[in-house]
Amino acid sequence: MALNLRKNHPLLKIINDSLVDLPTPSNISSWWNFGSLLGVCLTTQIVTGLLLATHYTADTSLAFSSVAHMCRDVQFGWLIRNLHANGASFFFICIYIHIGRGLYYGSYLNKETWNIGVVLLLTLMATAFVGYVLPWGQMSFWGATVITNLFSAIPYIGQTLVEWAWGGFSVDNPTLTRFFALHFLLPFAIAGLTLVHLTFLHETGSNNPLGIPSDCDKIPFHPYYSIKDILGFAMMIALLAALALFSPNLLGDPENFTPANPLATPPHIKPEWYFLFAYAILRSIPNKLGGVLALAASILVLFLIPLLHKSKQRSMTFRPLSQILFWALVANLLILTWVGSQPVEHPFIIIGQLASISYFTIILILFPLASMLENKLLNL
Protein backbone atom coordinates (compact mmCIF):
# COMPACT_ATOMS: atom_id res chain seq x y z
CA MET A 1 0.00 0.00 0.00
CA ALA A 2 1.36 3.46 -0.95
CA LEU A 3 2.44 5.79 1.84
CA ASN A 4 0.10 8.67 2.58
CA LEU A 5 2.17 11.69 1.49
CA ARG A 6 0.22 14.08 3.73
CA LYS A 7 1.18 12.07 6.81
CA ASN A 8 4.74 11.10 5.88
CA HIS A 9 6.36 13.93 3.91
CA PRO A 10 8.68 15.90 6.28
CA LEU A 11 7.08 19.28 5.48
CA LEU A 12 3.50 18.21 4.74
CA LYS A 13 3.49 16.24 8.00
CA ILE A 14 3.98 19.47 9.99
CA ILE A 15 1.11 21.18 8.13
CA ASN A 16 -1.05 18.06 8.50
CA ASP A 17 -0.45 17.87 12.27
CA SER A 18 -1.28 21.58 12.65
CA LEU A 19 -4.22 22.08 10.29
CA VAL A 20 -5.69 18.73 9.22
CA ASP A 21 -5.34 15.87 11.72
CA LEU A 22 -4.98 18.13 14.76
CA PRO A 23 -7.10 16.67 17.60
CA THR A 24 -9.41 19.51 18.70
CA PRO A 25 -11.99 19.71 21.53
CA SER A 26 -15.48 19.07 20.14
CA ASN A 27 -17.09 21.96 22.02
CA ILE A 28 -14.94 25.04 21.28
CA SER A 29 -17.05 28.06 20.34
CA SER A 30 -16.54 30.92 17.88
CA TRP A 31 -14.36 32.68 20.48
CA TRP A 32 -11.69 30.19 19.36
CA ASN A 33 -11.84 31.55 15.77
CA PHE A 34 -9.79 34.64 16.57
CA GLY A 35 -6.41 32.87 16.64
CA SER A 36 -6.75 31.88 12.99
CA LEU A 37 -8.23 35.31 12.19
CA LEU A 38 -5.02 36.84 13.58
CA GLY A 39 -3.12 34.64 11.11
CA VAL A 40 -5.26 36.05 8.29
CA CYS A 41 -4.63 39.61 9.57
CA LEU A 42 -0.87 39.01 9.64
CA THR A 43 -0.86 37.55 6.12
CA THR A 44 -2.98 40.44 4.78
CA GLN A 45 -0.76 43.03 6.47
CA ILE A 46 2.46 41.46 5.16
CA VAL A 47 1.10 41.26 1.58
CA THR A 48 -0.38 44.80 1.51
CA GLY A 49 2.67 46.14 3.40
CA LEU A 50 5.08 44.63 0.88
CA LEU A 51 3.13 46.23 -1.99
CA LEU A 52 3.17 49.59 -0.18
CA ALA A 53 6.90 49.33 0.55
CA THR A 54 7.60 49.03 -3.19
CA HIS A 55 6.25 52.58 -3.68
CA TYR A 56 7.21 54.21 -0.38
CA THR A 57 10.27 56.43 0.13
CA ALA A 58 11.66 56.59 3.67
CA ASP A 59 12.91 60.18 3.55
CA THR A 60 11.43 63.15 5.43
CA SER A 61 11.21 65.26 2.28
CA LEU A 62 9.55 62.50 0.22
CA ALA A 63 7.60 60.22 2.60
CA PHE A 64 4.35 62.23 2.65
CA SER A 65 4.43 62.78 -1.12
CA SER A 66 5.23 59.12 -1.81
CA VAL A 67 2.10 58.07 0.13
CA ALA A 68 0.01 60.66 -1.75
CA HIS A 69 1.49 59.48 -5.07
CA MET A 70 0.59 55.91 -4.16
CA CYS A 71 -3.04 56.83 -3.54
CA ARG A 72 -3.34 58.92 -6.73
CA ASP A 73 -1.12 57.32 -9.35
CA VAL A 74 -0.54 53.66 -8.48
CA GLN A 75 -3.06 51.07 -9.72
CA PHE A 76 -5.32 50.35 -6.72
CA GLY A 77 -2.74 52.07 -4.50
CA TRP A 78 -5.56 53.79 -2.57
CA LEU A 79 -7.16 50.39 -1.89
CA ILE A 80 -3.89 48.76 -0.78
CA ARG A 81 -3.20 51.66 1.56
CA ASN A 82 -6.73 51.65 3.01
CA LEU A 83 -6.66 47.87 3.52
CA HIS A 84 -3.27 48.14 5.27
CA ALA A 85 -4.27 51.05 7.53
CA ASN A 86 -7.62 49.52 8.53
CA GLY A 87 -6.16 46.01 8.63
CA ALA A 88 -4.13 47.19 11.62
CA SER A 89 -7.38 48.07 13.42
CA PHE A 90 -8.81 44.61 12.71
CA PHE A 91 -5.54 43.05 13.90
CA PHE A 92 -5.97 44.79 17.26
CA ILE A 93 -9.71 44.02 17.50
CA CYS A 94 -8.89 40.33 16.97
CA ILE A 95 -5.94 40.25 19.39
CA TYR A 96 -7.93 42.00 22.15
CA ILE A 97 -10.84 39.55 21.74
CA HIS A 98 -8.33 36.66 21.63
CA ILE A 99 -6.73 37.82 24.91
CA GLY A 100 -10.18 38.39 26.46
CA ARG A 101 -11.14 34.83 25.48
CA GLY A 102 -7.95 33.51 27.09
CA LEU A 103 -8.68 35.47 30.26
CA TYR A 104 -12.32 34.33 30.49
CA TYR A 105 -11.75 30.64 29.84
CA GLY A 106 -8.47 30.25 31.75
CA SER A 107 -6.37 29.53 28.64
CA TYR A 108 -3.53 31.41 30.39
CA LEU A 109 -2.82 28.26 32.40
CA ASN A 110 -0.93 27.06 29.30
CA LYS A 111 1.85 29.31 30.59
CA GLU A 112 4.32 29.13 27.69
CA THR A 113 1.62 29.74 25.09
CA TRP A 114 0.25 32.67 27.13
CA ASN A 115 3.65 34.29 27.75
CA ILE A 116 4.63 34.10 24.08
CA GLY A 117 1.20 35.56 23.30
CA VAL A 118 1.99 38.57 25.52
CA VAL A 119 5.35 38.98 23.76
CA LEU A 120 3.43 38.84 20.45
CA LEU A 121 1.12 41.61 21.68
CA LEU A 122 4.11 43.80 22.64
CA THR A 123 5.75 43.17 19.24
CA LEU A 124 2.49 44.00 17.45
CA MET A 125 2.18 47.25 19.42
CA ALA A 126 5.77 48.19 18.52
CA THR A 127 5.11 47.39 14.84
CA ALA A 128 1.92 49.47 14.75
CA PHE A 129 3.64 52.39 16.48
CA VAL A 130 6.61 52.56 14.08
CA GLY A 131 4.25 52.05 11.12
CA TYR A 132 2.07 54.98 12.17
CA VAL A 133 5.11 57.28 11.87
CA LEU A 134 5.86 56.37 8.23
CA PRO A 135 3.30 58.56 6.34
CA TRP A 136 5.05 61.54 8.02
CA GLY A 137 1.88 63.51 8.73
CA GLN A 138 1.47 65.82 11.75
CA MET A 139 0.15 63.11 14.09
CA SER A 140 2.84 60.67 12.86
CA PHE A 141 5.58 63.13 13.75
CA TRP A 142 4.19 64.33 17.07
CA GLY A 143 3.10 60.86 18.13
CA ALA A 144 6.66 59.65 17.50
CA THR A 145 8.08 62.64 19.39
CA VAL A 146 5.84 62.18 22.44
CA ILE A 147 6.15 58.40 22.73
CA THR A 148 9.92 58.13 22.10
CA ASN A 149 10.40 61.00 24.58
CA LEU A 150 8.93 58.79 27.31
CA PHE A 151 12.21 56.85 27.38
CA SER A 152 13.90 60.00 28.70
CA ALA A 153 12.07 59.33 31.99
CA ILE A 154 14.40 56.37 32.61
CA PRO A 155 16.86 57.59 35.26
CA TYR A 156 20.49 58.27 34.31
CA ILE A 157 20.47 56.73 30.78
CA GLY A 158 17.11 58.12 29.59
CA GLN A 159 18.24 61.12 27.53
CA THR A 160 21.12 59.21 25.92
CA LEU A 161 18.72 56.38 25.08
CA VAL A 162 16.24 58.74 23.39
CA GLU A 163 18.92 60.47 21.30
CA TRP A 164 20.28 57.05 20.33
CA ALA A 165 16.78 55.95 19.23
CA TRP A 166 16.25 59.21 17.32
CA GLY A 167 19.66 59.15 15.67
CA GLY A 168 20.01 62.85 16.48
CA PHE A 169 18.58 65.54 18.75
CA SER A 170 15.00 65.34 17.49
CA VAL A 171 12.73 63.09 15.42
CA ASP A 172 14.16 63.55 11.92
CA ASN A 173 15.34 61.68 8.82
CA PRO A 174 17.44 59.04 10.66
CA THR A 175 14.40 58.29 12.87
CA LEU A 176 12.15 57.80 9.85
CA THR A 177 14.59 55.49 8.05
CA ARG A 178 15.15 53.26 11.09
CA PHE A 179 11.40 53.16 11.82
CA PHE A 180 10.82 51.98 8.24
CA ALA A 181 13.48 49.28 8.70
CA LEU A 182 11.84 48.16 11.95
CA HIS A 183 8.35 48.25 10.46
CA PHE A 184 9.52 46.00 7.64
CA LEU A 185 11.34 43.58 9.96
CA LEU A 186 8.97 43.16 12.92
CA PRO A 187 6.04 41.46 11.09
CA PHE A 188 8.43 38.62 10.22
CA ALA A 189 9.42 38.41 13.89
CA ILE A 190 5.67 38.22 14.65
CA ALA A 191 5.33 35.38 12.11
CA GLY A 192 8.22 33.52 13.76
CA LEU A 193 6.80 34.01 17.26
CA THR A 194 3.41 32.82 15.98
CA LEU A 195 4.98 29.48 15.02
CA VAL A 196 6.50 29.19 18.51
CA HIS A 197 3.11 30.15 20.01
CA LEU A 198 1.45 27.33 18.01
CA THR A 199 4.22 24.84 18.84
CA PHE A 200 3.59 25.35 22.56
CA LEU A 201 -0.20 25.30 22.04
CA HIS A 202 0.01 21.91 20.28
CA GLU A 203 2.04 20.50 23.19
CA THR A 204 -1.03 20.78 25.45
CA GLY A 205 -3.87 21.10 22.93
CA SER A 206 -6.58 23.75 22.96
CA ASN A 207 -8.54 24.62 26.06
CA ASN A 208 -12.36 24.54 25.81
CA PRO A 209 -15.30 26.55 27.23
CA LEU A 210 -15.76 24.16 30.17
CA GLY A 211 -12.10 24.39 31.15
CA ILE A 212 -11.91 20.61 31.65
CA PRO A 213 -9.62 18.05 29.95
CA SER A 214 -11.11 17.00 26.62
CA ASP A 215 -8.76 14.18 25.55
CA CYS A 216 -11.64 11.68 25.63
CA ASP A 217 -13.66 13.73 23.12
CA LYS A 218 -11.45 15.14 20.38
CA ILE A 219 -12.37 15.61 16.71
CA PRO A 220 -10.09 16.33 13.71
CA PHE A 221 -9.54 20.00 12.95
CA HIS A 222 -10.36 19.42 9.27
CA PRO A 223 -13.17 19.55 8.10
CA TYR A 224 -15.01 20.63 11.28
CA TYR A 225 -13.04 23.69 12.34
CA SER A 226 -11.43 24.49 8.98
CA ILE A 227 -14.91 25.21 7.58
CA LYS A 228 -15.87 27.12 10.74
CA ASP A 229 -12.71 29.23 10.44
CA ILE A 230 -13.42 29.99 6.78
CA LEU A 231 -16.78 31.49 7.81
CA GLY A 232 -14.88 33.75 10.25
CA PHE A 233 -12.40 34.69 7.50
CA ALA A 234 -15.24 35.63 5.13
CA MET A 235 -16.96 37.76 7.78
CA MET A 236 -13.78 39.59 8.77
CA ILE A 237 -12.64 40.19 5.19
CA ALA A 238 -16.13 41.51 4.35
CA LEU A 239 -16.01 43.92 7.31
CA LEU A 240 -12.46 45.03 6.44
CA ALA A 241 -13.44 45.60 2.80
CA ALA A 242 -16.53 47.55 3.89
CA LEU A 243 -14.46 49.80 6.19
CA ALA A 244 -11.66 50.28 3.63
CA LEU A 245 -14.09 51.10 0.80
CA PHE A 246 -16.88 53.07 2.48
CA SER A 247 -15.17 54.86 5.35
CA PRO A 248 -11.39 54.44 5.09
CA ASN A 249 -10.57 57.47 7.27
CA LEU A 250 -13.10 56.75 10.03
CA LEU A 251 -10.45 55.55 12.51
CA GLY A 252 -7.60 57.80 11.32
CA ASP A 253 -6.65 61.27 12.55
CA PRO A 254 -7.41 64.25 10.28
CA GLU A 255 -4.11 65.84 11.45
CA ASN A 256 -2.30 63.25 9.32
CA PHE A 257 -3.53 64.96 6.14
CA THR A 258 -1.11 67.78 7.03
CA PRO A 259 2.60 67.08 6.35
CA ALA A 260 4.79 66.88 9.48
CA ASN A 261 5.85 70.28 10.79
CA PRO A 262 8.22 70.38 13.79
CA LEU A 263 7.26 74.05 14.37
CA ALA A 264 3.49 73.53 14.82
CA THR A 265 2.12 71.25 17.53
CA PRO A 266 -1.37 69.77 16.93
CA PRO A 267 -3.96 70.84 19.58
CA HIS A 268 -4.59 67.25 20.77
CA ILE A 269 -1.84 64.68 20.38
CA LYS A 270 -3.34 61.20 20.62
CA PRO A 271 -2.45 57.76 19.29
CA GLU A 272 -4.62 55.44 17.18
CA TRP A 273 -7.74 54.10 18.97
CA TYR A 274 -6.13 50.76 19.87
CA PHE A 275 -3.54 52.48 22.11
CA LEU A 276 -5.94 54.92 23.79
CA PHE A 277 -6.54 52.77 26.91
CA ALA A 278 -2.79 52.62 27.61
CA TYR A 279 -2.42 56.32 26.76
CA ALA A 280 -5.17 57.16 29.28
CA ILE A 281 -3.30 55.20 31.97
CA LEU A 282 -0.05 57.01 31.03
CA ARG A 283 -1.76 60.43 31.29
CA SER A 284 -3.58 59.68 34.54
CA ILE A 285 -0.34 59.88 36.57
CA PRO A 286 0.97 63.46 36.90
CA ASN A 287 4.60 62.29 37.01
CA LYS A 288 6.62 61.35 33.93
CA LEU A 289 8.41 58.27 35.27
CA GLY A 290 5.28 57.14 37.16
CA GLY A 291 3.23 57.43 33.98
CA VAL A 292 5.78 55.44 31.96
CA LEU A 293 5.85 52.69 34.62
CA ALA A 294 2.02 52.56 34.70
CA LEU A 295 1.96 52.38 30.89
CA ALA A 296 4.41 49.46 30.90
CA ALA A 297 2.54 47.78 33.78
CA SER A 298 -0.79 48.02 31.94
CA ILE A 299 0.48 45.48 29.39
CA LEU A 300 3.11 43.60 31.43
CA VAL A 301 0.46 42.79 34.09
CA LEU A 302 -0.68 40.09 31.62
CA PHE A 303 2.45 38.09 32.52
CA LEU A 304 1.19 37.88 36.12
CA ILE A 305 -2.26 36.52 35.30
CA PRO A 306 -1.31 32.80 35.45
CA LEU A 307 0.24 33.44 38.90
CA LEU A 308 -2.92 35.18 40.16
CA HIS A 309 -5.21 32.24 39.30
CA LYS A 310 -6.60 31.12 42.67
CA SER A 311 -9.75 29.30 41.52
CA LYS A 312 -10.10 25.51 41.63
CA GLN A 313 -11.91 25.80 38.28
CA ARG A 314 -10.11 26.79 35.10
CA SER A 315 -12.85 28.57 33.19
CA MET A 316 -15.19 31.39 34.31
CA THR A 317 -18.17 29.53 32.79
CA PHE A 318 -19.50 28.52 36.22
CA ARG A 319 -18.10 31.47 38.23
CA PRO A 320 -20.67 34.30 38.27
CA LEU A 321 -18.61 36.61 40.56
CA SER A 322 -15.56 36.42 38.31
CA GLN A 323 -17.83 36.93 35.28
CA ILE A 324 -19.13 40.20 36.74
CA LEU A 325 -15.53 41.33 37.34
CA PHE A 326 -14.50 40.29 33.82
CA TRP A 327 -17.24 42.36 32.18
CA ALA A 328 -16.50 45.23 34.58
CA LEU A 329 -12.90 45.07 33.31
CA VAL A 330 -14.12 45.19 29.69
CA ALA A 331 -16.34 48.21 30.47
CA ASN A 332 -13.41 49.81 32.30
CA LEU A 333 -11.15 49.40 29.25
CA LEU A 334 -13.83 51.00 27.05
CA ILE A 335 -14.00 53.95 29.48
CA LEU A 336 -10.19 54.27 29.39
CA THR A 337 -10.28 54.20 25.57
CA TRP A 338 -12.87 56.99 25.53
CA VAL A 339 -10.99 59.09 28.14
CA GLY A 340 -7.74 58.68 26.18
CA SER A 341 -9.37 60.41 23.20
CA GLN A 342 -10.53 63.41 25.28
CA PRO A 343 -8.52 66.55 26.16
CA VAL A 344 -6.70 66.71 29.51
CA GLU A 345 -9.27 68.69 31.51
CA HIS A 346 -11.97 68.20 34.13
CA PRO A 347 -13.86 65.78 34.34
CA PHE A 348 -11.74 63.54 32.08
CA ILE A 349 -8.68 63.70 34.35
CA ILE A 350 -10.45 62.27 37.40
CA ILE A 351 -12.42 59.72 35.31
CA GLY A 352 -9.13 58.52 33.80
CA GLN A 353 -7.48 58.26 37.22
CA LEU A 354 -10.40 56.27 38.68
CA ALA A 355 -10.53 53.98 35.62
CA SER A 356 -6.75 53.41 35.81
CA ILE A 357 -6.97 52.48 39.50
CA SER A 358 -9.92 50.15 38.82
CA TYR A 359 -8.04 48.45 35.95
CA PHE A 360 -5.17 47.36 38.21
CA THR A 361 -7.47 46.70 41.20
CA ILE A 362 -9.72 44.33 39.23
CA ILE A 363 -6.80 42.35 37.78
CA LEU A 364 -4.43 42.24 40.75
CA ILE A 365 -6.79 42.21 43.74
CA LEU A 366 -10.44 41.51 42.90
CA PHE A 367 -9.95 38.55 40.51
CA PRO A 368 -7.93 36.48 43.05
CA LEU A 369 -10.29 37.46 45.92
CA ALA A 370 -13.40 36.54 43.92
CA SER A 371 -11.80 33.21 42.96
CA MET A 372 -11.05 32.34 46.59
CA LEU A 373 -14.57 33.37 47.64
CA GLU A 374 -16.08 31.18 44.90
CA ASN A 375 -13.96 28.23 46.05
CA LYS A 376 -15.32 28.72 49.56
CA LEU A 377 -18.96 29.15 48.44
CA LEU A 378 -18.74 25.97 46.34
CA ASN A 379 -16.86 24.06 49.08
CA LEU A 380 -14.03 23.26 46.67
From Swiss-Prot:
Residues holding heme b b566: 98, 197
TM stretches of this protein: 34-54, 78-99, 114-134, 179-199, 227-247, 289-309, 321-341, 348-368
Annotated InterPro entries: Cyt_b/b6_C, Cyt_b/b6_C_sf, Cyt_b/b6_N, Cytb/b6-like_sf, Cytochrome_b, Cytochrome_b_C_euk/bac, Cytochrome_b_N_euk/bac, Di-haem_cyt_TM
Domain of life of the organism encoding this protein: Eukaryota
GO biological process, one term: mitochondrial electron transport, ubiquinol to cytochrome c
Residues that coordinate or bind heme b b562: 84, 183
Membrane topology: Multi-pass membrane protein
Gene Ontology terms, MF aspect: metal ion binding; ubiquinol-cytochrome-c reductase activity
Protein's UniProt keywords contain 4Fe-4S: no
Cofactor(s) listed: heme b
UniProt key word Mitochondrion: yes
Residues that bind a ubiquinone: 202
Record's GO cellular component terms: mitochondrial inner membrane; respiratory chain complex III
Pfam families the record matches: Cytochrom_B_C, Cytochrome_B
Cofactor binding comment, as recorded: Binds 2 heme b groups non-covalently.
SUPFAM superfamilies per the UniProt record, alphabetical: a domain/subunit of cytochrome bc1 complex (Ubiquinol-cytochrome c reductase), Transmembrane di-heme cytochromes
Chief location of this protein within or outside the cell: mitochondrion
Function according to Swiss-Prot or TrEMBL: Component of the ubiquinol-cytochrome c reductase complex (complex III or cytochrome b-c1 complex) that is part of the mitochondrial respiratory chain. The b-c1 complex mediates electron transfer from ubiquinol to cytochrome c. Contributes to the generation of a proton gradient across the mitochondrial membrane that is then used for ATP synthesis.
PANTHER family: CYTOCHROME B (PTHR19271:SF16)
Similarity comment: family membership: Belongs to the cytochrome b family.
Note: Heme 1 (or BL or b562) is low-potential and absorbs at about 562 nm, and heme 2 (or BH or b566) is high-potential and absorbs at about 566 nm.
Protein name: Cytochrome b
Naturally occurring in which organism (per UniProt): Manorina melanocephala (Noisy miner)
